[in-house]
Amino acid sequence: MIRFALTIGSVVALLATGTAGAADSNKVLHWEFRAAETGFDPGRVTDYYSNTVIEAVFERLLTYDYLARPSKLVPEAAEGMPQIGDNGKTYLFRIRKGAYFAPDPAFKGAKRELTAEDVAYSIKRHMDPKNRSYWQWLVDGKIVGLDELAQKAKVGVTGLDYDARIPGLEVVDRYTIRIRLTRTDYNFTYILAMPAMSIVAREVIDAYGEDSNAHPVGTGPYMLTRWARASKISLEANPSYHGFVWSFQPGIEPGDNEIVARMKGRKMPVIGRIEISVIEEEQSRWLAFQRGELDILLLPGTFAPVAMPGNKLSPELARRGVTINQLIDPEITYTFFNMRDPVLGGFAKEKIALRRAIAMAYDTAEEVRVVRKDQAVEVQSPIPQGIAGFEPSNKSGIAFDPAAANALLDKFGYRRGADGFRTLPDGAPLVIKRWSRSGDSEARELDDLWSKSLKRIGLRMETVTTKFADLLKMSRQCQPMMASAAWIADYPDADNFMQLLSSANIGQSNYACYSSPEFDRLYSAARQLPDSAERNAIYREMNRRLEADTVWKLGVSRVRTMLIQPTVKAYKKHPILHAEWAFIDMERER
């Protein structure tokens, strides 16, 4: 929730040092991705893995305090927190001087400083029709004059006029920008801290055009030096980075005081290189960590009983000096039903009954126990714990009940044939096609569990496997009949999850392609309110609408257990940030 009393004089947590010379090239952190990245242009990608790299390469106006829980915003490219006026509709930011982009041929040998113009340009890109930004929903309808500018680009032939001045993005001077909103947005400061709002240089985008995903050039602590798609990513400390002094205060969680004692006053970053390997198979990731080829590992669920018997670190790992850091991710997994699919979609009673039966046939508790190895908790609404708007008393109205699911299908004419499988009410064959990502043993386990679940109510299921990046693309295009997805918080507010069902976000984040005037009306009403009991009441009504239409089958929030080699120091998983690399230390590589 926005606090309107914030001023430019707010405390700056990331104190600039004027140099990034502290980075040691002999300190190399080995990291893993469980799925392939898609690229590194902040305006063109949405996946977790790409955004992890984007977070390290670019800066945003705001970021998060490394240790504060609940998550707390602090300045990054901004000099301080914004001056907020006009009842939360005007934001005045002063840009930190001396923040330079990493060297790149696009700058023709000149040092290039980040300015207020870059902030305005980066925001405008999300509304450029040519970019087809999946993050358009962050600014669509929010910034005074921006929609009108985008509309001119849609009907014109020259594209978006980035040089045009609009009231909502007023560049006051080289280091000052005033952002004017069309209405109060209680989450706008959170939005400005998202990887999608990373600040890019126009010269770089112009130079590389459609290949901008391969050429991320930012003012952040690291820069891309090697990219073997879907295999290896190498980052090195950005020689142009201004650096900062580690000055975070301990929170209330165990280990914070030890982290502060080790890191306070250090010039950051100190790790000189990040080596990222894309390793899709769980066993391969586990063995790589066991061999010391990975420094930090997100514990694969399959190996949770081995690494953490009884939910305690195994004696073998403890003897080696391995430590753990755990949190329940502020996320949801869910299975969406394509509301445009001719078999499964639509609002006819028999279609809703089919979706409801499928949802009731799936045992999420079995998923937690068998697939997740108890490294997850069931979610009861689209708003996970740790997020403003979460209510522990909320319980899903769609429970595991295969008997009721069978009765529902019988009632609406989905009859069983001689082979035991059901047909459509008109007698035509009925096949449920569930799309899934390839190359992942966990995904295969989920495929098997879904197949078993549907078989128990007489539904034949076929699995369509595809690469993770292609599955995302197809989902935005409303192609899968049904598929599973996950959404981890971009910012710690329920709005970030409820937007997944807004009809305005079809083609972006609304993979179910759900369009409900009633849901949209409620969503619009909720966005006018701060975090409050009144807003929570609207969210409960939205959840009832979602369940009545049965657009999703809710899944879990995963327990993120990070295994940490003894060479890594001061690591703590952040609930919102993806890449904590600039905040930690490690022993030198021998």
Residue ranges of each PLM-predicted region?
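N-terminal secretory signal peptides that target proteins for export/translocation
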Residues: 1-2
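Bacterial N-terminal signal peptides
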Residues: 5-16
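Sec/Tat signal peptide C-region and signal peptidase I cleavage site
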Residues: 18-22
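N-terminal lobe/hinge region of extracytoplasmic solute-binding protein
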Residues: 32-86, 217
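Extracytoplasmic/periplasmic ligand-capture domains
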Residues: 66-67, 90-92, 96-132, 165-169, ...
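Residue-level recognition of beta-strand termini and adjacent short loop/turns
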Residues: 85-87, 173, 229
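Non-catalytic accessory/assembly modules
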Residues: 135-157, 162-192
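Active-site-proximal polar cores
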Residues: 555
